[in-house]
Amino acid sequence: MGLLDQKFDKGGVVITAAENVLNWARLSSLWPMGFGLACCAIEMMATNASNYDLERFGIFPRSSPRQSDLMIVAGTVTFKMAERVVRLYEQMPEPRYVLSMGSCSNCGGPYWEHGYHVVKGVDRIIPVDVYVPGCPPRPEALIGGLMKVQELIREEKFAGDRREAIERLKPKKVKAEDVIVETSASAKKLQEAAS
């Protein structure tokens, strides 16, 4: 017996908004692309193992950005790697989401104060939707972050001009030199505040 063989109390019609159906389909088939850069990647790989079974949430990891709708940035993002992170993000189709996993990708981690080579948070180069704290976060925390992304998708509205929203979400072109100048300026402020 299937669902359509059963009688409905008030007729045989189900009414809902089209955006609810689209959001349900997108959140039930989330395809993340893992971008593992350091020790957080080990925990991300553990999350993909059979102990946690991400497929029960409809999450199927992909290795190509062109097939992914979620980028998981796990680990330390250096200035050399920042350009590649932006390039992969730009190759992802819309709508796209970013999950920042671990202290290093959230805010620079232990390299925050003295690491001249580390981006002080991946949100300086691409927009981040969900942050997962920890050093490194446990697989359970990553699963919680993935469920938070699914909640964001469930509540998304398509009303209004979508092109304007897409333009607002597009990352600005960032060069490593600009971030280095900004970082050195903030380092000077920290030194002045310490003295």
UniProtKB/Swiss-Prot annotation:
Instruction: Cite the entry's keywords alphabetically.
Output: 4Fe-4S, Cell inner membrane, Cell membrane, Iron, Iron-sulfur, Membrane, Metal-binding, NAD, Quinone, Translocase, Transport
Superkingdom: Bacteria
Tell me the membrane topology, using the record's own terms. Peripheral membrane protein
State its location(s): Cell inner membrane
Instruction: Please verify whether the record's keywords include Cell inner membrane.
Output: yes
The entry lists its GO molecular-function terms as:
4 iron, 4 sulfur cluster binding; iron ion binding; NADH dehydrogenase (ubiquinone) activity; NADH:ubiquinone reductase (non-electrogenic) activity; quinone binding
Q: Which reaction does it catalyse?
A: a quinone + NADH + 5 H(+)(in) = a quinol + NAD(+) + 4 H(+)(out)
Q: Which InterPro entries match?
A: NADH_UbQ_OxRdtase-like_20kDa, NADH_UQ_OxRdtase_20Kd_su
Q: Which Pfam families match?
A: Oxidored_q6 (PF01058)
- Gene3D superfamilies noted in UniProt: 3.40.50.12280
The cofactor required is:
[4Fe-4S] cluster
GO terms for CC? plasma membrane; respiratory chain complex I
- Which residues are noted in the entry as [4Fe-4S] cluster-binding? C39, C40, C104, C135
Say yes or no: keyword Cell membrane present: yes
Q: Name one GO biological process term.
A: electron transport coupled proton transport
Co-factor: note: Binds 1 [4Fe-4S] cluster.
Q: What is its main location?
A: membrane
For this protein, the record's NCBIfam families field holds: nuoB_fam, PRK06411.1, PRK14813.1
Q: What does this protein do?
A: NDH-1 shuttles electrons from NADH, via FMN and iron-sulfur (Fe-S) centers, to quinones in the respiratory chain. The immediate electron acceptor for the enzyme in this species is believed to be a menaquinone. Couples the redox reaction to proton translocation (for every two electrons transferred, four hydrogen ions are translocated across the cytoplasmic membrane), and thus conserves the redox energy in a proton gradient.
How does the annotation summarize its subunit structure? NDH-1 is composed of 14 different subunits. Subunits NuoB, C, D, E, F, and G constitute the peripheral sector of the complex.
Q: Which family does it belong to?
A: Belongs to the complex I 20 kDa subunit family.
Under HAMAP family, the record lists: NDH1_NuoB
| Protein known as | NADH-quinone oxidoreductase subunit B 2
User: What organism does the record attribute this protein to?
Assistant: Chloroherpeton thalassium (strain ATCC 35110 / GB-78)
